[in-house]
């Protein structure tokens, strides 16, 4: 979650907690909310953005991104989330981000036909996945890999604001999309570097890994090794 005051957990909690309790009362689970929010945001991004309907697309995606944030509040209201729920939420976030940049990439390439902007959008698409992967892989290795100037909330604000303003009814400002995409492309590359540096400077990051012993096929299948009559299949 962003450290900006208007994106703080306390600010969101004042709005999301009552909504979370209401959704739990009608029988929805946090995982169901995650799937619903992701499906709707992906549909909005992949249907509206390629058609050049950037303002409606940004509104739809933003609404369901906020809706998807309720899953965490729901999990806390019922006493905690599950490990599967955490993995599902992270996976759905990556799918949603990919759909947003993929839909915009289609419009930029085939609607606007702006080759330079295609480059910026591709950078945003790739780095949005890499930034998250660095953190996940680092934490799986017991290292730190968080931080950076651009995290997911800021990334969504920049790209959706740029898309929406560029197609805003009556007072559209078309340069808003290129400005947003290039800003995001540059800051995302910087964030990748920052996270890699954080991993590199984590305690134990440069220690040599101890290679694991190779496992023979017959061992993996539970068959006894030849010459080991005392070992039985398990």
From Swiss-Prot:
Region (Disordered), start-end ranges: 211-234
Positions of Mg(2+) 2 binding: 68, 89, 93
Membrane spanning residue stretches: 28-48, 54-70, 91-110, 116-134, 155-173, 179-197
Sites where the protein binds Mg(2+) 1: 68, 71, 89
EC number: 2.7.8.-
Residue positions binding a CDP-1,2-diacyl-sn-glycerol: 31-34, 72, 76, 82
Gene Ontology annotations of biological process type: phospholipid biosynthetic process
Membrane topology: Multi-pass membrane protein
Catalytic reaction(s) noted: a CDP-1,2-diacyl-sn-glycerol + 1D-myo-inositol 3-phosphate = a 1,2-diacyl-sn-glycero-3-phospho-(1D-myo-inositol-3-phosphate) + CMP + H(+); 1,2-di-(9Z-octadecenoyl)-sn-glycero-3-cytidine-5'-diphosphate + 1D-myo-inositol 3-phosphate = 1,2-di-(9Z-octadecenoyl)-sn-glycero-3-phospho-(1D-myo-inositol-3-phosphate) + CMP + H(+)
Keywords: Cell membrane, Magnesium, Membrane, Metal-binding, Transferase, Transmembrane, Transmembrane helix
Enzyme class, spelled out: transferase
Family: Belongs to the CDP-alcohol phosphatidyltransferase class-I family.
Function of the protein: Catalyzes the conjugation of the 1'-hydroxyl group of D-myo-inositol-3-phosphate (also named L-myo-inositol-1-phosphate) with a lipid tail of cytidine diphosphate diacylglycerol (CDP-DAG), forming phosphatidylinositol phosphate (PIP) and CMP. PIP is a precursor of phosphatidylinositol (PI) which is an essential lipid for mycobacteria required for formation of their cell wall.
Name the UniProt record assigns to this protein: Phosphatidylinositol phosphate synthase
Biological source species: Mycobacterium marinum (strain ATCC BAA-535 / M)
Gene that specifies this protein: pgsA1
């Amino acid at each position: 979650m962003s450290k900006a005051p208007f994106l703080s957990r306390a600010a969101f909690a004042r709005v999301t907690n009552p909504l979370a309790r209401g959704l739990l009362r009608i029988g929805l689970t946090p995982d169901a909310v995650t799937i619903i929010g992701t499906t709707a945001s992906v549909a909005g991004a992949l249907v509206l953005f390629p058609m050049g309907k950037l303002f409606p697309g940004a509104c739809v995606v933003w609404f369901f991104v906020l809706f998807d944030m309720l899953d965490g509040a729901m999990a806390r209201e019922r006493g905690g989330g599950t490990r599967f729920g955490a993995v599902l939420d992270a996976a759905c976030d990556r799918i949603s981000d990919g759909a947003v940049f993929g839909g915009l990439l289609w419009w930029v390439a085939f609607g606007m036909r702006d080759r330079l902007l295609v480059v910026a959008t591709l950078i945003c698409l790739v780095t949005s996945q890499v930034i998250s992967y660095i953190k996940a892989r680092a934490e799986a290795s017991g290292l730190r890999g968080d931080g950076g100037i651009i995290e997911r909330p800021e990334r969504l604000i920049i790209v959706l604001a740029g898309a929406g303003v560029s197609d805003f009814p009556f007072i559209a400002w078309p340069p808003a999309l290129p400005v947003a995409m290039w800003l995001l492309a540059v800051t995302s590359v910087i964030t990748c570097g920052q996270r890699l540096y954080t991993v590199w400077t984590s305690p134990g990051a440069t220690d040599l890994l101890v290679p694991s012993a190779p496992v023979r096929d017959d061992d993996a299948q539970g068959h006894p090794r030849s010459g080991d009559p005392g070992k039985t299949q398990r």
